[in-house]
Design a protein with these regions (language model features):
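Nucleotide-activated donor-dependent transferases that construct or modify glycoconjugates
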Residues: 2-13, 62
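Short catalytic helix/loop segments, enriched in acidic residues and glycine
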Residues: 20-30
Length: 118
């Protein structure tokens, strides 16, 4: 069974609920084929120093974050750190700060080599 970690981390709000990540997890847990192959951790939502996630990253197979202008720099640090700890893990970015235009996406991929899927 693969372990999946999703999240929307706030760097500006003390209290933040990861609604989008929770909705994705809830949806996936209703599909037997997904539920039998993937275990979803509680979504990440609290800002912590990147190093505080080191132990958690060792046990995660798939890591996905929602990217906004206000959390992009922190997410970049977090994803890069995850790949250092778990180079075989799969990383995903989604959200409004991920480019859809093919030319911008190509540049984004070059600037974010630690992101596998966006």
């Amino acid at each position: 069974m693969k372990t999946v970690q999703l999240g929307t981390i706030s760097v500006i709000h003390e209290t933040w609920l990861p609604y989008a990540a929770a909705c994705l997890i809830s949806y996936c847990n209703k599909i037997p084929e997904i539920k039998s192959q993937y275990k979803f951790n509680e979504p990440l939502y609290k800002y912590k120093p990147v190093e505080d996630y080191t132990d958690k990253f060792k046990d995660i197979d798939v890591f996905g974050l929602t990217c906004y202008v206000w959390n992009q720099a922190y997410n970049d640090q977090l994803m890069s750190h995850y790949k250092d700890i778990n180079p075989q893990g799969i990383t995903m970015y989604g959200g409004p700060n991920v480019p859809e235009d093919p030319k911008l996406a190509e540049q984004f991929a070059k600037e974010h080599p630690y992101i596998d899927i966006f």
